[in-house]
């Protein structure tokens, strides 16, 4: 009886360990020529599945491949910061939102999508309230 219990326990530990390992995400292969909107869609699909590390890789691809598409850059920066917030990585989230808000202090801020400024300010305010 005792031996059966030990084997059941070891089996349960192995099952849990395999589940944890399977949740770790490998680098995503992102094809060349994929548009920023396709990257956003893939990132959103990954986020919907709670595959946050995969989503961040897609958003990072926007930052790497399309640095001159300021609207997509703002989208990616906001979404990465928001994912960090959802993961309770508040220091990283705050840094991301703060860096994004710095863009809105520059001379060409009028060309930036307003929604990310508003949303970033709201999340930062919520984070401050949660600290109290």
Give a label for each model feature:
Residues 1-23:
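Sec-dependent bacterial lipoprotein signal peptides
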């Amino acid at each position: 009886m005792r031996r059966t219990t030990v084997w059941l326990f070891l089996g349960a530990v192995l099952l849990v360990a395999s589940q944890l390992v399977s949740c770790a995400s490998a680098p995503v292969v992102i094809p060349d020529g994929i548009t920023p909107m396709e990257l956003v869609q893939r990132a959103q699909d990954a986020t919907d599945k709670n595959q946050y590390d995969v989503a961040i890789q897609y958003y990072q691809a926007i930052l790497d491949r399309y640095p001159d598409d300021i609207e997509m850059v703002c989208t990616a920066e906001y979404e990465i910061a928001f994912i960090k917030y959802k993961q309770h990585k508040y220091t990283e989230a705050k840094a991301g939102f703060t860096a994004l808000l710095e863009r809105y202090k520059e001379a060409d801020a009028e060309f930036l999508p307003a929604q990310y400024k508003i949303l970033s300010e709201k999340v930062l305010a919520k984070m401050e309230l949660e600290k109290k």
